[in-house]
Amino acid sequence: MEGAMAVRVTAAHTAEARAEAGREAGEGGVAAAAALSSGGFLGLPAPFSEEDEDDVHRCGRCQVEFTALEDFVQHKIQKTCHRAPQEALPTTPAATALLDQEVVPTAAEGGPDEPITVAHIVVEATSLAEDISHAPDLVGSGHIKEVIVAAEAEPGDVEMAEAPGSPNHQELGLLGEGEQAHVKLLVNKEGRYVCMLCHKTFKTGSILKAHMVTHSSRKDHECKLCGASFRTKGSLIRHHRRHTDERPYKCAKCGKSFRESGALTRHLKSLTPCTEKIRFSISKDTAVGKEEVPAGSSASTVGTVTSSVAGDPMETSPVIHLVTDAKGTVIHEVHVQMQELPLGMKALTPESPDSEELPCSSENSRENLLHQAMQNSGIVLERVAGEESALEPAPPSGSSPQCLGDGSPELPLLKVEQIETQVASEAATVPRTHPCPQCSETFPTAATLEAHKRGHIAPRPFTCTQCGKAFPKAYLLKKHQEVHVHERRFRCGDCGKLYKTIAHVRGHRRVHSDERPFPCPQCGKRYKTKNAQQVHFRTHLEEKPHVCQFCSRGFREKGSLVRHVRHHTGEKPFKCYKCGRGFAEHGTLNRHLRTKGGCLLEVEELLVSEESPSAAATVLAEDPHTVLVEFSSVVADTQEYIIEATADDTETSEATEIIEGTQTEVDSHIMKVVQQIVHQAGAGHQIIVQNVTMDQETALGSEATAADTITIATPESLTEQVAMTLASAISEGTVLTARAGPNSTEQATVTMVSSEDIEILEHGGELVIASPEGQLEVQTVIV
């Protein structure tokens, strides 16, 4: 039929099918037998019944049909056939449609011609025709299933029709053009479905359907947490475990969990099996008694989990212990930190009697042997309640172990905090006799020293862009970069102190707690942190592992060595933000800031300015008089500045500023006062300089009201300073009035200069003021 493509199924043949090749059934069977005896073949138009369909092998390329499997295989091996034009796979847009149904005709309730769906296959059919036709290695195996599948359609879109030239063959087609495509499913000699794009094999067609999605560019499964998209739902599930840290695949030998089954498989196939790793690792068991298992879990056994950490025996590593019931539900989770104790060290748990001394017995001998082996090996056992409740107190050391409901002995109990404290205390007693030749750090064993030395020679591809320090791992570089972060964004809720990271805040919050869970095993003194307890314990051992490279002095802490080295190098990294002074230690900087008078930034600046004073300050320091300058309200509110200079000390002067009746210390020269209101000289001003006495001050008050006139009354000894002050104040049209000292002369000398002219007008010959290029300059000339 036109506009629709045929759907037919040719089943795979086995040895039994070849044995029945001579069976005759109707007209089609006779024709098949004749073809077999003569070695010929049957053409496509030859009619055959549905029963003979199992005995016919059709070439998918040239559409030639064979009744003998050997002839069909020989035909495929020769590769001499050509594609039949009438049966060629479509090259129309229909070949690009998505395929998702495999349909086989079978006898159903509706009749023998009604098809049923047995599998779903979704593929991109763009290049399947060429890929399928060029697979002689798979086709030549003789086990072929040719399936022409159609795109998924609604029930009303499918109709039955007869193919041209084959009235007895039932075909299934779609009404719309471009809605189906031909796909051959090849089955290898093991009976597995073969993907024609990557040649992977699968057990069923449904698995092949799920696999074919990976060859598509569509990503319909999106993660709701981060927005990443994936082609398959399984990929999304595996990705989601990275957010939840779910590890459903657990090794039955060592208890280690993995996110993916492939990771567990690689773990089991590793060069060093996990059973060997247990002998060199630190183990700890967490057991749940039968009476403590929640309802619904198995009550016949005690659920135990053994966690081990592969690596150096003396290296402390965090271990996560999970207690699960029979269904795999997590009952309790304990975080501990274990370290292997040296030989001869006292065990942490009370000595347990041997198996023959146990008063109770159990039917399960294997379980008893397990408990006995665990106790003899020194493994700490902990019984944890099913709820997240506090641990029960441990039984006294002299008491015999009680029996559980199933007859097994009850496990001795220890709190996790007690385990950490005692292990850390006893680990601190181990002498460190193996120093590193490249740095000053020492180690207790040769194995830990070798592991440390590998860090010196390992490649360091991750380099800090700020200081150039290199690291072998990316997470070490990220942790190091916190040193260069000066911003402190994390605040302690108790005292308000700021820290760079939230981990520092958590460690600091122990200071506000009264709990001291880490006692010294030698003197019993308790500490809030394990590090403080370890540092204190070194005082009993007189151990100083950190040695100075300059003077060979030893220190118990690395920080003490760093502070000591600064005395050799002169480094002072702690700077005062006020005065810029550097200090070698942070505590010294804090004491500097907490001094009674505070940081003397202003006093130090005053001393520096007096060492190299300006010309105006020099003139002012040489004159013993006091000058009062009043700024007019034209610029701002009336402010009074008094600059005093004592006659005894002519080199240094103490400045006093009076602002609205309040007296404070200011700089010693008047230029800092004037420069705040005057920057540029303006045109159109008249300047009057007059030497007056104290009696003439009132007469000058009327002249001070003019905005374009500046009147200055000054003694003759301060003429040069007044000229400099006048040059600074001319641009604003400010009125300045200065009181003269008691030693001023009564004779007045007035000099008037127009700022628009460069011509100098002299009346007294003592002061010359010029205005070149619009900028007013005031110069004094001694006549």
Swiss-Prot record:
Region (Interaction with BMI1): 434-598
A cellular component term, taken from the record's GO annotations: cytoplasm
Pathway in which this enzyme or protein is active: Protein modification; protein ubiquitination
Annotated region described as Mediates dimerization, DNA-binding, transcription repression of CCNA2 and interaction with HMGA2, given as residue ranges: 185-264
Main subcellular localisation: nucleus
Pfam families named in the record: zf-C2H2 (PF00096), zf-C2H2_6 (PF13912)
Inactivation phenotype: Death before 7.5 dpc probably at the peri-implantation stage. Blastocysts display defects in mitotic progression and chromosomal segregation and increased apoptosis.
Catalysed reaction equations from the record: S-ubiquitinyl-[E2 ubiquitin-conjugating enzyme]-L-cysteine + [acceptor protein]-L-lysine = [E2 ubiquitin-conjugating enzyme]-L-cysteine + N(6)-ubiquitinyl-[acceptor protein]-L-lysine
Ranges where the record places region Mediates interaction with RASSF1: 574-596
Tissue expr: Ubiquitously expressed.
Location of this chain's protein in the cell: Nucleus, Nucleoplasm; Cytoplasm
Catalytic EC class: transferase
GO BP: cell division; DNA replication; positive regulation of transcription by RNA polymerase II; protein ubiquitination; regulation of cell cycle process; regulation of DNA-templated transcription; regulation of mitotic cell cycle, embryonic
UniProt protein name: Transcription factor E4F1
Protein source organism: Mus musculus
